[in-house]
């Protein structure tokens, strides 16, 4: 669990930001079309947003079943809701079914290939599957759009650590710490870096 939960807590922050950004973009577009939206459609959108909010809260609390249920309700209201597919995919993968989780995040990508939050979620699902090279590629896609995305940089560091490439693992860990020093505490506790605890460079980086 120490390999997943610290990342999850940070992941939810990033996923939430991504969803909020997409929602803001959608709201801007919706405002331009407001004259053509009926009261019924507006009510449905409010309900949809509520489902997503509850789903994110459930995911943050580790209640994956509830997150899946609420994201599914969002999809029922709007079958083209990329954010809901992405969130459901991550929750499903964390709940143990990485195959279904990956299918949902891929569906989210098909619906909205520019959703950077979904890139991160796909990276995490691939990571949960043990497909580290694929995971790294999606973290890299996040960094193409957001070069200072701390937890994608850190994600790549953990992949190199798991693959036994110590030099690259520490190089990427240093990059992540330079962006956000709070990474130190996470790295010091995670199993990815447990074997590094006697490594002089690692101890210097995280302050052990």
Question: In which residue ranges do the predicted regions lie?
Answer:
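Position-specific recognition of the canonical hydrophobic site in helix A of tetratricopeptide repeat
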Residues: 59, 86, 92-93, 127, ...
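Structural marker of alpha-solenoid helical repeat scaffolds
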Residues: 77, 111, 145, 179-180
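Alpha-helical segment of the N-proximal tetratricopeptide repeat
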Residues: 44-83, 94
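Structural signature of tandem alpha-helical TPR/SEL1-like repeats
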Residues: 61-70, 94-107, 129-141, 164-172, ...
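Canonical tetratricopeptide repeat
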Residues: 87, 121, 155, 189-190
């Amino acid at each position: 669990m120490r390999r997943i939960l610290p990342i999850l807590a940070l992941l939810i922050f990033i996923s939430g930001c991504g969803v909020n950004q997409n929602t803001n973009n959608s709201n801007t577009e919706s405002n331009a079309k407001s004259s053509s939206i009926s009261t019924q459609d507006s009510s449905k959108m409010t309900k949809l947003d509520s489902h997503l909010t509850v789903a994110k809260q459930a995911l943050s609390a580790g209640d994956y079943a509830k997150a899946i249920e609420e994201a599914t309700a969002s999809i029922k209201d709007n079958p083209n809701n990329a954010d809901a597919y992405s969130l459901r995919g991550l929750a499903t993968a964390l709940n143990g079914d990485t195959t279904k989780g990956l299918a949902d995040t891929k569906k989210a990508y098909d619906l909205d290939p520019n959703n950077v939050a979904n890139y991160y979620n796909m990276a995490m699902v691939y990571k949960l599957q043990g497909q580290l090279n694929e995971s790294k590629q999606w973290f890299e896609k996040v960094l193409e759009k957001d070069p200072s995305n701390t937890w994608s940089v850190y994600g790549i560091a953990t992949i190199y650590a798991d693959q036994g490439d110590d030099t690259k693992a520490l190089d990427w860990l240093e990059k992540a710490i330079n962006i956000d020093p709070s990474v130190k505490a996470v790295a010091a506790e995670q199993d990815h870096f447990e074997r590094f605890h006697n490594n002089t460079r690692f101890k210097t980086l995280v302050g052990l």
